[in-house]
Amino acid sequence: MNIMAYRNKKLYIILSLIVFSLAVTFIDAFVHPPYFSKIPIKILFFLALPMLFFVIWREEWSEFKSLFRFQKKGLLISLLLGLAIFGVILGGYFALRGVIDFSGVTASLTSGMGITADNFVWVAIYISIMNSFLEEFFFRGFGFITLKKYVNVKFAYFFSPVLFAIYHVGMLVGMFHPAVLALILFGLIVGGLIFNALNDKLGNIYPSWLTHMAANFAINTIGFILFGIL
């Protein structure tokens, strides 16, 4: 492989994740756009940054297709893990709601993003299914499976989870006490490592997507409770 092309591919992926993650967290923390107006912009960049990579370097097109190659192998483990994560997240909420103040969550969602009890169901559906798929394509497909061809595997394993956590910082700031926020971010990094491990064996994004959906279903169930819908 041409050394310059190899270097450029590596830099493109790394810079794409860094710039996008920092931009999203900055906008969420300081601009506070309405959630529904932010959706099309995020979709555009979630898709455009990876797709531009595969258009520039067409020899990598087979890599792109492999990210979506469906295999039954490993799906059962992903489903079982997803159910376990669902139980842990929901159980953790019920165990800690007397200790941790969750009242700032709905207030922050409403004031910062315009999410209310009236529109939360649509937000929950989008986050659980569509947004989780886009995040898996960007952070685990493009940011891990594709990246690890050009960097040390250990670096690839930790790079995308750290950026995945940074990407969430702007949205979570103000919802929780700093210590709780730090714990959540640590959980996002650990979750990213688990997602990478699931996808590493099969080379596609479906295992982590199923598990990610289960985690989001649990988080959104908590959201329904906090908004008084359940």
Regions found by a protein language model. Give the residues of each.
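Membrane-interface helix/loop boundary segments of multi-pass membrane proteins
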Residues: 134-159, 200-204
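Hydrophobic alpha-helical transmembrane segments
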Residues: 14-15, 75-80, 121-125, 154-159, ...
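Juxtamembrane "helix-exit" motif on the non-cytosolic side of transmembrane helices
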Residues: 25-33, 96-99, 169-174
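Alpha-helical transmembrane segments in multi-pass membrane proteins
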Residues: 9-61, 109, 113-114
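Small-polar-interrupted transmembrane alpha-helices in polytopic inner-membrane proteins
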Residues: 156-169
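Short, Lys/Arg-rich, polar N-terminal cytosolic tail immediately upstream
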Residues: 1-7
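Juxtamembrane helix-loop-helix connectors linking adjacent transmembrane helices
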Residues: 36, 63-131, 229-230
